[in-house]
Amino acid sequence: MQPSRTRVSFFETGETMKQRKKSYLSIFVIFFSLFFFGIFMYNDNLKSSIADFTSSNPFSSSFVELPPDECDLFTGQWVFDNKTYPLYKEEECEFLTEQVTCLRNGRKDSLFQNWRWQPRDCSLPKFNARVLLEKLRNKRLMFVGDSLNRNQWESMVCLVQSVIPPGRKSLNQTGSLTVFKIQDYNATVEFYWAPFLVESNSDDPEKHSIIDRIIMPESIEKHGVNWIGVDFLVFNSYIWWMNTVSIKVLRGSFDDGDTEYDEIKRPIAYERVLRTLGDWVDHNIDPLSTTVFFMSMSPLHIKSSDWANPEGIRCALETTPILNMSFNVAYGQFSAVGTDYRLFPVAENVTQSLKVPIHFLNITALSEYRKDAHTSVYTIKQGKLLTREQQNDPANFADCIHWCLPGLPDTWNEFLYTHIISRR
């Protein structure tokens, strides 16, 4: 007796095979759906990571195109540009002092903020705060000099502070030194008050309104000890030399209580001071670790007749730069526009004759065109905002020395920025 066999017809086998194929197909579809979903999610995360990197990487947004070394950055013209200038807004920089906040102090026109310096044969790189801060990481940038260098220091603080999160930046003053600290970069942007660079009776950062200003042209160590170890030093000294035709030079020492002095012609005293600075640089600066700059003179705009506006009152009624570039403000018709050009070659020659290089930034001529950019009557005097009556008396109260911010000093810092980011 043979065991019974289960018979499977060909019809039944075909159906089973179809069911198996459907099962395999379903598994295949599910597998590849999960696979492609994973790829999609990975790409999404990758895109997010790339986006995060791009936003935090200062070099990713655009390639910084530097001007060629042979290009003269200081010969060019002012171009109206209300799309990319100003580089920051007055109300967005909490660190600006009342001395320079012209719009807040009542100035109605703001066109002075919209002028861009265009070199004749090249272009300045667009200012990028993150690129600069990377160069300043673990470093110190210090401005040393008078209130015009403080003007430029305030500008630099505003240029970089916008990319720093709240609570990650601070400002502290101790004596002559004011320090803006950027925590995430362990970097500082500092200002050191030394209006004559050498020792003087005007060295108090708060109380220096002295009629008889006296200097010690060969004494710089008291200040210089505070400059040791700084990575980028930016010197200036000019406006305090312009109060008198001659300069009082102390016989002896302030520490010894000496009060007698000699009066020396301004260019001679200026050269003595800059040679003292040069000697200090040569003996104390390692050019491999410290870069030194010297800013040329920041001009005054006191006489409106100098720029062919006999009806003007100092700089008070000026709303546009000198736009006729055929006038040579430095050596031609406008040679008297706020600059003692006897001092210019002194500064240029001394800074270029040292063993340690000093980069001479020639801001003078291009700044002479900017009769419109001063604080004028929209500023303070003796620590207090000008009253309405004082504002209505520009002949006596217009400040045609300092500059509104945002404004011209931002351009000076664009030159400085170009040099710093070009440093290998």
From Swiss-Prot:
Keywords: Membrane, Signal-anchor, Transmembrane, Transmembrane helix. It is a single-pass type II membrane protein. It is found in: Membrane. GO terms for cellular component: membrane. The chain crosses the membrane at residues 23-43. Disulfide bonds: none annotated. The keyword Transmembrane helix applies. A motif (GDS motif) lies at residues 145-147. One of its GO terms (molecular function) is O-acetyltransferase activity. A motif (DCXHWCLPGXXDXWN motif) lies at residues 399-413. May act as a bridging protein that binds pectin and other cell wall polysaccharides. Probably involved in maintaining esterification of pectins. May be involved in the specific O-acetylation of cell wall polymers. PANTHER family: PROTEIN TRICHOME BIREFRINGENCE-LIKE 28 (PTHR32285:SF227), PROTEIN TRICHOME BIREFRINGENCE-LIKE 9-RELATED (PTHR32285). Contains 2 motifs that are conserved in esterases, but it is unlikely that this protein belongs to the catalytically active pectin esterases. Belongs to the PC-esterase family. TBL subfamily. This is Protein trichome birefringence-like 28. The lineage of its organism: Eukaryota, Viridiplantae, Streptophyta, Embryophyta, Tracheophyta.
